[in-house]
A protein has these predicted regions:
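Glycine-rich phosphate-binding loops of nucleotide-dependent enzymes
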Residues: 1-170
């Protein structure tokens, strides 16, 4: 997952994405190709724990939320509100520090950040690790909905029943 997303360097082989040779050198390269990663370790790799929910959601799309290098607060608020509502992120408000959310809601913030980039391919690396049963079901439902919308989902999990239950192909 980290190689596909451009975090780690590939040692050998060839990757093809959308019919073209694909060699990401950074996550930015992956995002430009429409590939997003919901990482295994959300606290170390997916979130900035000391920032509010809203800032985490738009972190990957700040360039799209600015005009002449000035952030457009109205646009940012619309995006954040859309994903907080759509993903049912339980937070008192978008200024709540993400470190104070439950594991399931933190995972939804990571997902919101990737959805805001409008990626066509989403890599879910251990998407339900460390979250409660209710949040797991919500994540599963979101993954199915994304697949129905035409998004390609790559799921990595150490739980075989989870893979069997969620996958078209293994």
């Amino acid at each position: 997952a980290r190689i596909i997303y451009g975090v780690d360097e590939k040692k050998s082989g060839t990757m093809i994405c959308k019919g073209e040779k694909y060699e990401p050198r950074s996550p930015k390269d992956a995002l430009l190709k429409g590939i997003g990663l919901i990482p295994e370790d959300r606290k170390q790799q997916g979130l900035v724990l000391g920032l509010p929910v809203g800032d985490n959601v738009v972190y990957s799309i700040l360039d799209k939320c600015s005009k002449a290098k000035v952030l457009q607060k109205k646009k940012i608020n619309e995006i954040v509100n859309q994903y907080v509502e759509e993903l049912k992120i339980k937070t008192p408000d978008k200024n709540q520090l993400v470190k104070n959310l439950s594991g399931g809601n933190q995972q939804k913030v990571v997902l919101a950040k990737m959805l805001a980039t409008n990626c066509d391919i989403l890599i879910f690396d251990e998407p339900t690790r460390g979250i409660d049963v209710g949040a797991k079901q919500e994540i599963y439902t979101l993954m199915v909905k994304l697949a129905e919308q035409g998004k390609a989902i790559i799921m990595i999990s150490s739980e075989m029943p989870e893979l069997i239950g969620m996958s078209d192909r293994i």
